[in-house]
Amino acid sequence: MNFNFANIFYVVIFILALELWCTINYFELNVHVGQPFKVPFECTTVVVDGFTDPNGVARFCLGCLSNVHRDEVVERARPHIGKGIELRHDEGGDVWLKVNSEHSVFLESPYLDSQCGDRPAVHKIYSSAELKVFDLKYSYRKMLDQAQHVQLARNMMKANIHGVSPEMAAAQNVGVDDYQKHCVLRMSFVKGFGPDYNRKRIEDTPCWIEVKLHWPLKILDQLLQPLDDAPSIQPQHHDQPQQPQQPETKQETKSEEKQDQVPTSSS
């Protein structure tokens, strides 16, 4: 891993090189509604509310979005979004949330999880509250640890080391989604979800947004680059004689290269 977060030069270069700092997608239940809302880097603050101004550069108004298949539950919930929320990034790449709505929002945030026992949770953020919901250094450390663990697993499998556990063998095939969760915030308006609610998943709530943060995604690309060049290795059964490898055809090699490619992030 040549990318060194400890050198602030790299952080500054990565952040300044980006035209956008986040992209926001709006959902009603499990349906994506409208177009992704892209926030320029120079707009340090973006507002997401329930009003109808379609022209705001740093204001995503959900009230003007139409959905011909809108559910009655969604119709009842949307007026209560009100003044919504405000997201702000600082010079260090951290992100802060302020709740302007009269109603609480319900948030999935790996950083807040780390402050509450490091277990996945749904965080209820009350009206008028303001707090940090994303920490760039924390996100980087988690993604780096995960990438190093995958690299170690692949090296052990490649070396055909005896006694590799099934967990270690499975670790080499960690998907991109497992990394990207450290680059994304998801929150629902008005209605809660999780173990304490009838709605267990955020996709069951009437109105919610997904915020993709571009600079941790850019860092993730750098972390995954060495893994792209190292195909996963199938575990060998050491109690059986190893079969000689058959020469690969060019067609098979192309197929494997496609499998090794990391899919791009969807907006």
Which residue stretches match the model-derived regions?
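Long, low-complexity, serine/threonine/proline-rich intrinsically disordered regulatory regions
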Residues: 1-78, 82, 120-267
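Forkhead-associated
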Residues: 76-79, 84-89, 93-127, 132
